[in-house]
Regions:
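Acidic, glycine-rich A-domain
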Residues: 1-161
Length: 161
């Protein structure tokens, strides 16, 4: 959780310095997704099984309701340990493709701290095959990876090209 929160805090600070008018929507998910407050996002965690598609679906609903891409620069970022129910992978991939098509930038960061059970997750491997010029995956294993991962994600921002 520390690595993901560090990454999101850095991202949050960057966005607030780059843009004058910023609105951030935080989505938390396990088997269901919900929009949460900034406080809940940074200080509480979700537990239980994971359906990544629920988070992506909720993000798309929020974008459709409040942040039409013709009026907003829309960015979506997701950090995860990479675990997902196998049965959800096709839906997660389809919705990730839809987020990439909708957003200026969509990034996926997989958090695998050094010294923990490390494996190539089905999510990271699957998402690395997703072809979109504004979609980027990163692997974050330590504090030292947070800044380079942040820079790698922002390099795919199609709003600045």
């Amino acid at each position: 959780k520390y690595l993901a929160r560090s990454f999101f805090f850095l991202l949050y600070q960057f966005i607030h310095t780059k843009y004058r008018r910023v609105e951030v929507a935080f989505v938390a998910h396990h088997t269901t997704a919900r929009e949460v407050t900034e406080e809940e996002f940074f200080h509480k965690g979700e537990a239980g099984g994971t359906l990544i598609s629920s988070g992506y679906q909720r993000a798309l609903e929020i974008i459709e309701a409040r942040y039409h891409p013709s009026l907003w620069n829309v960015y979506a970022f997701h950090c995860s340990d990479g675990d997902n129910f196998d049965s959800d992978n096709p839906a997660a991939l389809r919705l990730a493709q839809e987020l990439a098509a909708t957003c200026n930038l969509f990034g996926y960061g997989e958090i695998k701290p050094l010294g923990t059970r490390h494996y190539e997750s089905s999510m990271l491997g699957m998402f690395r095959r997703l072809e979109a010029d504004n979609f980027q995956t990163v692997l974050i294993e330590s504090r030292e990876d947070v800044w380079p991962s942040f820079r790698a994600l922002l390099a795919k921002d199609r709003a600045v090209k």
